């Protein structure tokens, strides 16, 4: 994959994930641009390939895992799922907490989400 294609894919992923949130959309685009500019001096093909691979992985993560939430008047969040979000299955419910680990990476802490209506 070329750097140009990886950059375009990153911009597409950001546009999908942050389509209704202009401040976050602008900040995400700026972050991608600054990442590209910081890697512009890379000359070794291995380094360039690694940077392109990393950008592609970030794009896939954003596109498939990032969901925007909007705080409602009742204090709950409305999650704006788009068609490319990976919803997964309920097989992990059968696992114990020890087998699953932690979503936040911190052992013993849990993440609570309010129900969406």
UniProtKB/Swiss-Prot annotation:
One of its GO terms (biological process) is mitochondrial respiratory chain complex III assembly. The keyword Heme does not apply. The keyword Transit peptide applies. It is found in: Mitochondrion matrix. GO terms for cellular component: mitochondrial matrix. It comes from the Eukaryota. Interacts with RIP1. Assembly factor required for Rieske Fe-S protein RIP1 incorporation into the cytochrome b-c1 (CIII) complex. Functions as a chaperone, binding to this subunit within the mitochondrial matrix and stabilizing it prior to its translocation and insertion into the late CIII dimeric intermediate within the mitochondrial inner membrane. Modulates the mitochondrial matrix zinc pool. This is Mitochondrial zinc maintenance protein 1, mitochondrial. It comes from Lodderomyces elongisporus (strain ATCC 11503 / CBS 2605 / JCM 1781 / NBRC 1676 / NRRL YB-4239). The gene is MZM1.
């Amino acid at each position: 994959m070329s750097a140009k294609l990886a950059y375009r894919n990153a911009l597409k992923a950001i546009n999908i994930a942050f389509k209704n949130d202009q401040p976050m959309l602008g900040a995400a685009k700026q972050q991608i641009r600054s990442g590209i500019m910081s890697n512009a001096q890379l000359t070794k093909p291995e380094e360039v390939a690694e940077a392109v691979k990393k950008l592609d992985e970030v794009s896939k993560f954003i596109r498939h895992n990032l969901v925007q939430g909007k705080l409602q008047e009742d204090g709950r969040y409305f999650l704006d799922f788009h068609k490319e979000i990976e919803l997964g299955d309920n097989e992990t419910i059968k696992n114990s907490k020890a087998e699953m680990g932690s979503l936040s990476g911190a052992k013993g802490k849990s993440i609570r989400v309010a129900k969406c209506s």
